């Protein structure tokens, strides 16, 4: 082996690295653009770009000293830096959530440990004003050795943290050669078991910094308001190169470039007072510009003046109670993997701002350093998480008989093992030291799912002593094994993952001395989450509940190109023949891999809208509104638009922009005048929409921030079109009858309907020589399981809800009052099992072909709750024009419809498909008055006296159940029209609590009625 085995040595976490410091880019002058153009600094030299690269399947296969000067790399390929080598045909992709991808035998990793040799040359000219040169790696997975001009520079690990080396003595004027050996695994990999694809390489920028011989090495800015929250106090602690202080000046400028504070310094501290300070918060992210100037160097940074603290279990920022409406964010892209460019992170943040997200947890490692400058600038509260996760230790083979044994077993291998204390604390320090000057960072998190013990007690102690101005977080602190008493004195928050609402209420009492935070909740996997509104209500009704972070931001996937038909192909766990893997559990984001929003993100946006309507009095013409923002007055942020919808159609609209009317302080409520014309009859609603008042960096003027639909009473509160369609059809006809043991055919000159006496449903329906059914009608209790059904799915399949058949017993038919009435007793059952439910189905056929169905069902209570109950019709695919009046335009369910409103919408069955990468139930619409599907000749409408749910699709639920990827789906050749009494809610039980009882389809007695009305066009 050509390198020492530091990669399996707890005593050598780093070799020759510089002490940790805050991130900044020095220059010879003030920098105006700290994020987008850091290369403008004359002291910054980017080494990212094309490198020579060779892949080895094992570090033991590296025989030649490729790092020597003049080594022939002509046989090497070219690879971009930053990147991950799995995306360039080397090794293989692997997604695993908890389980380690190698045997659990720390500090050892497999001999078959892949590695990559990187080499590049660059030109260098020594700067007399800045002769010292430092080499920075912002992210390398998992560990690396580095050489300059053939000489060993050093070694480092901790994939998502910066490693800096002094290379002054290794550089020469002219051509220089840098060589890096990156290993896939090292002893640090036991602490990097995050839920993600496992990728390797130099995945963040590499650069050189030229610096003076003497000067600032590090600085720590503490900028907080005074007790009155009117003025600001800025304190800067400076660490000097070689410990030798220099003279310099510190200047603070406001956003108009006015000098607001200045101080000369020649020691270790700087103090500045800011009168009438603008305080930083996520709604008004005001930043001052700090300029630190010493001989030969200028450091430019941004400063936000703010204070975060907890008191009596309540979280405060600048003395104001705040709530986190947050998300967990991984670095993930289907093409570039972990390598996330500035443009990519800006796109993420733009979409977040568009959807009312105000907080980010950097799950589960620090982001690239410039990300935090964007968080400061755009306004996000950040939980900055250290690169610590050892979840795989939970999976080691053991026999547990109690919670205490489980926790003890998980704790003992790493979290409560002193051997890992140095590594755990090191990872925390590297996170905290680098990001300590970022005002957006309000909470330090020690890591994720590592269990608890002495290692994290030490990390928390160091963090709190080093930075008492911020709060500390670590969810796994709750995994304790009695009777050992753990030290929680340095932990500021009580944190949970995926608690139920009832658990939260209980724990708010039990642990009420600390703010309660959900570091993960409402698992956004596939079609979901479905219970956001319930969590919102609890978050904003409990002072000690400071909010939460949705799991998670984006679907993780690998771009595999396109099919022959042009369909996009994304791969997830198991698609690369890897072991172990966790399937599509990585497809759990609010956005698709390409950042197209899921309907779950649309739901989040409107649940967390900045303003809510709390009441409307149509008689008085008054609207009561509440400002849910924490700092901003409504008049400065938004304007109000409104529409009156009657039977789904807009009848009136207007705007309120008067600042006097919209004068509403944060957290306050008021009533304003808003008179509308209310019809005598019809289903009427007032839709209030909030729009961005003034453009920001990411949101344009008039951008929609959220909306509210308020029902307005009329005399009948009924949709008049539905009411008209529900009238008894006029006219009479002479019915023709044809009946045998199996079928009953009822016909007139206008239609011919064939009824299957074995099923109690129609086999064929022909209206005006137009077939209405491609296949026999069905009673339907199955849905293609959503990802959030992943647990109950097994229960449903054990009950064989996916294999049901309908059996009719006795059928009675008669012609009476100008119509035909058919009554059949029936049951639904599955092979080898007893009846699931039984009841009576009644059909009434009118002379114009209109058909009413009344279904009564009694479910055997021994069976589990149902996925759905309703009718399934297979219409010819020519019935492709959809019109409906109900909750739209996006999919909606009983617990997931805040992004929808009642209107009349036009679409097609193909457009209704919400194209989840793993196919599942999608595209349903809740609370509908009617739904019509039309061909160029005829239309079939479903309408009811009560509202119903429906779904129109080109795919069957069987196809959606069976196929593993969306690109595998094949249209069935029909338009599948599901008309449902109800569907079960969506919830978030893929990694969370069971679906709330009120959203379950748990009734054992069901009565459902709907009318099917065909018409010629």
Located regions from the model:
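Accessory beta-strand-rich segments of carbohydrate-active enzymes
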Residues: 3-14, 37-38, 52-56, 86-92, ...
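Surface beta-strand/loop "capping" patches
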Residues: 213-243, 599-638, 726-741, 855
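Extended acidic/polar, glycine-enriched regions
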Residues: 172-175, 239-311, 680-723, 730
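Extended substrate-binding grooves/exosites of carbohydrate-active enzymes
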Residues: 1-39, 88, 96, 151, ...
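Beta-strand/loop-rich accessory regions of lumenal/periplasmic or secreted enzymes
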Residues: 87-89, 184, 281, 675-681, ...
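An acidic-aromatic loop/edge-strand motif
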Residues: 87, 92, 99-108, 157, ...
């Amino acid at each position: 082996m050509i390198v020492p085995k530091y990669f399996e040595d707890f005593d050598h976490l780093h070799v020759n690295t510089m002490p940790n410091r805050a991130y900044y880019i020095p220059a010879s002058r003030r920098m105006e653009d700290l994020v987008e153009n850091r290369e403008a600094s004359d002291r910054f030299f980017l080494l990212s770009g094309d490198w020579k690269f060779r892949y080895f399947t094992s570090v033991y296969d590296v025989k030649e000293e490729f790092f020597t000067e003049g080594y022939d790399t002509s046989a090497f390929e070219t690879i971009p830096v930053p990147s991950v080598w799995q995306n360039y045909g080397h090794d293989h992709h692997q997604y695993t959530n908890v389980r380690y991808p190698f045997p659990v035998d720390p500090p050892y990793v497999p001999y078959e440990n892949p590695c990559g040799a990187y080499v590049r040359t660059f030109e260098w000219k020594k700067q007399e004003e800045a002769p010292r040169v430092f080499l920075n790696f912002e992210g390398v997975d998992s560990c690396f050795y580095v050489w300059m001009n053939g000489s060993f520079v050093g070694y480092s690990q901790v994939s998502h943290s910066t490693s800096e080396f002094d290379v002054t003595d290794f550089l020469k004027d002219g051509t220089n050669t840098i060589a890096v050996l990156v290993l896939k695994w090292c002893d640090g990999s036991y602490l990097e078991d995050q839920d993600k694809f496992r990728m390797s390489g130099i995945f963040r920028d590499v650069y050189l910094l030229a610096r003076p011989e003497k000067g600032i090495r590090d600085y720590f800015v503490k900028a907080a308001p005074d007790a009155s929250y009117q003025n600001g106090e800025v304190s800067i602690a400076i660490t000097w190169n070689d410990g030798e202080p220099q003279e310099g000046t510190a200047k603070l400028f406001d956003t108009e470039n006015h000098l607001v504070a200045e101080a000369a310094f020649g020691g270790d501290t700087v103090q500045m007072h800011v009168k009438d300070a603008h305080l930083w918060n996520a709604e008004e992210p005001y930043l001052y510009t700090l300029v630190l100037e010493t001989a030969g160097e200028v450091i430019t940074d941004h400063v936000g003046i703010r204070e975060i603290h907890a008191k009596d279990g309540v979280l405060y920022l600048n003395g104001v109670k705040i709530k986190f409406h947050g998300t967990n964010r991984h670095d993930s892209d289907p093409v570039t993997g972990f390598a996330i460019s500035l443009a990519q992170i800006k796109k993420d943040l733009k979409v977040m701002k568009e959807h009312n997200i105000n907080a980010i947890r950097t799950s589960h490692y620090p982001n690239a350093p410039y990300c935090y400058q964007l968080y400061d600038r755009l306004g996000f509260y950040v939980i900055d998480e250290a690169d610590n996760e050892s979840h795989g230790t939970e999976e080691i083979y053991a026999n547990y008989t109690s919670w205490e044994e489980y926790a003890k077993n998980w704790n003992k291998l790493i979290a409560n093992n002193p051997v890992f204390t140095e590594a755990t604390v090191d990872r925390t320090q590297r996170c905290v030291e680098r990001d300590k000057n970022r005002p957006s960072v309000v909470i330090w998190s020690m890591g994720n799912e590592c269990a608890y013990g002495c290692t994290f007690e030490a990390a928390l102690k160091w963090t709190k002593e080093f930075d008492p101005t911020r709060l500390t977080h670590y969810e796994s602190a709750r995994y304790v094994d009695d009777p050992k008493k753990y030290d929680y004195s340095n932990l500021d928050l009580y944190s949970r993952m995926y608690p139920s609402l009832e658990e939260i209420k209980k724990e708010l009492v039990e642990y009420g001395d600390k703010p309660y935070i959900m570091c993960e909740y409402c698992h956004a996997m596939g079609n979901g989450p479905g219970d956001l509104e319930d969590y919102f209500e609890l978050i904003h009704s409990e002072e000690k509940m400071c909010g939460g972070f949705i799991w998670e931001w984006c679907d993780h996937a690998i771009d595999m190109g396109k099919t022959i038909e042009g369909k996009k192909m994304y791969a997830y766990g198991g698609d690369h023949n890897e072991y172990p893997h966790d399937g599509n559990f990585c497809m759990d984001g609010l956005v698709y891999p390409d950042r197209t929003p899921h309907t779950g993100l649309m739901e989040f946006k409107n649940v967390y809208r900045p303003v809510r309507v709390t009441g409307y009095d149509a008689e008085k013409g008054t609207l009561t509104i509440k400002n849910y923002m924490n700092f901003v007055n409504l008049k400065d942020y938004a304007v109000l638009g409104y529409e009156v919808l009657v039977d789904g159609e807009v009848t009136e609209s207007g705007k309120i922009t008067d600042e006097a009317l919209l004068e509403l302080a944060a957290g306050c409520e008021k009533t304003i005048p808003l008179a509308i014309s209310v019809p005598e009859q019809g289903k009427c609603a007032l839709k209030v929409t909030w729009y961005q008042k003034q453009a920001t960096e990411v949101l344009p003027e008039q951008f929609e921030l959220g909306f509210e639909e308020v029902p307005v009473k009329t005399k009948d509160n009924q949709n008049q079109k539905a009411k008209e369609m529900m009238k008894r059809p006029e006219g009479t006809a002479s019915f023709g009858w044809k009946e045998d043991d199996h079928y009953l055919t009822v016909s007139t000159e206008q239609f011919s309907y064939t009824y299957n006496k074995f099923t109690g449903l129609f086999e064929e329906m022909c209206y005006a020589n137009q077939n209405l059914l491609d296949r026999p009608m069905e009673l339907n209790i199955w849905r293609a399981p959503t990802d959030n059904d992943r647990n109950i799915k097994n229960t449903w399949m054990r009950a064989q809800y996916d294999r049901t058949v309908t059996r009719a017993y006795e059928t009675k038919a008669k012609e009476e009052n100008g119509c035909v009435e058919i009554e059949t007793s029936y049951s639904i059952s599955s092979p080898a099992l007893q009846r699931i439910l039984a009841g009576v189905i009644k059909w009434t056929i009118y002379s114009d072909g209109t058909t009413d169905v009344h279904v009564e069902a009694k479910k055997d209570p021994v069976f589990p709750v149902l996925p759905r109950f309703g009718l399934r019709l297979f219409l010819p695919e020519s019935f492709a024009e959809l019109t409906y009046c109900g909750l739209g335009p996006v999919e909606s369910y009983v617990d997931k419809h805040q992004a929808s409103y009642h209107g009349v919408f036009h679409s097609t069955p193909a457009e209704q498909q919400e194209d989840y990468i793993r196919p599942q139930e999608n595209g349903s619409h809740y609370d509908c008055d009617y739904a019509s599907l039309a061909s160029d000749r005829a239309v079939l409408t479903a309408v009811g006296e009560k509202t119903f749910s429906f779904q129109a699709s080109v795919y069957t639920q069987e196809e959606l159940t069976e196929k593993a990827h969306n690109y595998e789906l094949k249209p069935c050749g029909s338009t599948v029209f599901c008309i449902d009494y109800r569907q079960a809610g969506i919830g978030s039980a893929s990694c969370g609590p069971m679906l709330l009882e009120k959203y379950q389809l748990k009734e054992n007695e069901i009565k459902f009625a709907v009318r099917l009305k065909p018409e010629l066009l």
